[in-house]
A protein has these predicted regions:
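C-terminal peripheral helix-coil segments that are non-catalytic and often amphipathic
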Residues: 1-10, 154, 158-169, 179-228
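Short, Lys/Arg-enriched N-terminal segment that forms or immediately precedes the first helix
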Residues: 8-19
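Short, amphipathic alpha-helix enriched in basic
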Residues: 14, 22-44
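Alpha-helical structural segments
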Residues: 29-33, 68-90, 101-105
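Helix-turn-helix
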Residues: 41-68
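Hydrophobic alpha-helical connector segments
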Residues: 72, 88-122, 178-181
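A short secondary-structure junction motif
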Residues: 80, 84, 113, 131, ...
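Amphipathic alpha-helical packing segments from all-alpha helical-bundle domains
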Residues: 97, 124-166
Length: 228
């Protein structure tokens, strides 16, 4: 049975929260599918409207432009990842175990959760891998950062960095390591699929176990902790 999970996202990203209406959820569902199919550059609100049997104007009632829609989708994904880490580390005392769970969640969040009917996290993850940098490698990034567009990503990264500090309070680069783990997961999946000479891992049949192993080796190696 499908359930409704309401993600609290920055209100400046949208004109009307798409999670609140059937049409809005349909916009989210099909924008994910369409961006995955044709890419963000080719994606337009007109093409989306045609796909959902609505009008371009109806999409503009929710989002000012497709850039904000992309940021919204990424924030939804990052918030879902944070929820996954929170849930899976609940009542865990061993910080090393928490970091392994967090790393697993970074990878596992990419897998489809059939309980959320309007978001296919597996497809959304492909968008994160291929398109995420287009959300914040822009001329407007400083203003958008001041407006809190990327707070969800920063909170997620801080959660991981706090676990790293819990393991080793003297480690000097917890924030850098946390953000690197998040980016590394996406980068090496992309490399494995499209630029294999840039990575040592392979991704076949949706098996991301090598990605998880890479993140563990990298993180625990820098923290001088032997994996068992």
């Amino acid at each position: 049975m499908a359930i409704t999970i309401q993600m609290k996202l920055n209100e400046q990203l949208y004109l009307k929260d798409p999670q609140d209406t059937r049409l809005g959820r349909k916009i989210i569902q099909h924008s994910i599918l369409l961006i995955d199919e044709i890419g963000f550059e080719a994606f337009t609100f007109k093409k989306l409207a045609d796909q959902i049997g609505s009008t371009e104007a109806s999409v503009y009632r929710y989002f000012t432009n497709k850039h904000l829609l992309l940021v919204y989708l990424l924030c939804w994904y990052w918030e879902w990842m944070k929820f996954s880490i929170d849930y899976n580390t609940m009542n865990i005392e061993d910080a090393r175990k928490k970091l392994r769970i967090a790393i697993s969640s970074i990878v596992d969040t990419t897998r489809r959760n059939t309980s959320i009917e309007f978001v296919d996290e597996d497809v959304l993850h492909r968008i994160v891998v291929a398109e995420a940098t287009k959300a914040y490698h822009t001329k407007e990034v400083d203003k958008e950062n001041r407006d809190g567009f990327f707070m969800t990503y920063k909170v997620l990264s801080k959660k991981i960095s706090d676990i790293i500090t819990e393991i080793d309070p003297n480690y000097p680069y917890p924030r850098a390591l946390a953000s690197t783990l998040l980016e590394m997961a996406n980068n090496h999946i992309y490399f494995a699929l499209h630029l294999p000479a840039l990575t040592d891992i392979t991704v076949e049949g949706g098996d991301l176990s090598q990605v998880e192993k890479l993140l563990e080796d990298f993180a625990f190696g820098l923290l001088n902790i032997e994996l068992k």
